[in-house]
Amino acid sequence: MTRFTFSVFAALLLAAGTAQAQAIDKAPMKRTAAYDGPGMYHNYCSACHGLGALGDGPAAKALTKAPADLTRISARNGGTFPETRIKRYIEGLDEVAAHGSRDMPMWGELFRSMERDTVPLRVQALSDFLKSIQK
């Protein structure tokens, strides 16, 4: 392969990769039913927290701080699920002091952009799902 042909080929590959990355960045979030806690977890949380909510999702290795094991929330809180605090955290109203700056996306903003009147139902459904998977 000549140097010119190789250069053209490399430029085309680079352009295709850049276009694909831009398309991925602009891909809309999957919509879920407001009452579907497991579906919301799968669509919005599992990439980092993992399908089993153990903090081992495929994106976890790319993060500077390891995602929490969400099956142990109650265990870390004296055996009681802190529902109000979890709901405020999901909605982006509170931060977890141990995390320092907030790395987790604030889903309340996403939920409000979908249908403002369903935010409380969405937050409750996701909180109920997290409560249901406690060990």
Locations of the language-model features?
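Sec-exported extracytoplasmic/periplasmic mature domains
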Residues: 42, 46, 75, 91-95, ...
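Bacterial N-terminal signal peptides
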Residues: 7-16
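Sequence context surrounding c-type heme c attachment/ligation sites in exported
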Residues: 35-43, 116-117, 134-135
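Axial heme c-ligation environment in periplasmic c-type cytochrome domains
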Residues: 68, 89-121
